[in-house]
Amino acid sequence: MILSLLFIATVFAAINAVPYPACAADTLQWTAVNIPVEGSTGGLWKLANGSDIRYLTMANDGTLYCYANPAGTTHTLFKSTDGGRSWTTPGKVTDVIIDIAALPQDGATIYYATASRVYKSEDGGNTFVTLPPSPGGAGSGNVSISSIDVVRVGDGNTVAVSTIDTDAAQFGGVYLLEDRPLMGTWVNTAIGNYDVYRVAFSPNYNVDRQIIAIASNEVDTFAISKIYNGCWGQNPANACIGGIMPSAANIAFPNSYNYLSGAASFFLGIDTGVNKGDVYTISSTIIPTAYTATDLHIGSAYGINAVDIAGLAISGSTILAGCADSAGVYLSNDGCISWTQCTRAPTGQSGTCILTVPDFNTQHKAYAVTRGQESAFSYSNDGGLTWNQVRTIDFLLVQ
């Protein structure tokens, strides 16, 4: 014990004998650092306080578009040409956007929809023209546009919009417009008594002339198809998901989708707003010619019976599903046999919209946008397992 005390005393004496360097206060100085500020710098956005980010869309040249509503500007359409690292506001659009569609055959042509109108740009969003207004009476009588899609057909484009009517026992529909130099008017495709939450052209529309709609009769949800000039639900017959009414829906087509093969499947993500949704496989059979819906129960491994879905993306055997009521992402790498939650989610609180890059199977890169506090544009380079925020971050730094 005495030897230990002597050793400690010797050590302290040695330490005290060593002269201290000059006081830090005498030699060091604090320097102000310019932290990022809200809004744009040189036209490029970094922080976007108060912003919700939605409808992330990729043109065929890789250009990204989205809707956002930051407090620092009235502009709402954002564009990135560098994978989301920087964003500009082309066209100075100030509308409340409800959907964005890029023409698959032309990277410079995009469309966006409001609740009652559709707008078109052929120069990457720098200028827009207005298409004929109010398809199906949208903008009056509680009727509003719910989604938009577009495809090149011949020497022009065909535009499809879906509408809903929030009045009880009143319904929306699907309307087509031939966007050509001699433009006509919106044509009612007569889908019947349904509110339609999503409309999409088949990836092979120029061959199979198939349009798919996700609709509700205010009780159940239906996947409905129309081929050429035939009637809706005629071939194949509708798939019904009983007891579920959507507030929004998403469709994702596999790379190999081919309706004419007679056994084509696509994926449906349903957001009910009350957490009763999920991801479904919609499959067509040859005999009888009908759709069937299979609930994939993506949360079952975690004891979760249903998951509302805000975004859906597919590449090869990998499927990514973004949650509607959180920023979470579920992924399957084996064609929907098993599902895993991401280990680090995109920042934000809800409304996770997802895109995969065209060469996802090589790069394993995907993008996501979210809503709520700390919503942001995020990316993943490991197939959706972990996510990192990049830009348009909903955060206010106070100096």
Language model features with spans:
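Extracellular glycan-interacting surfaces
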Residues: 3-399
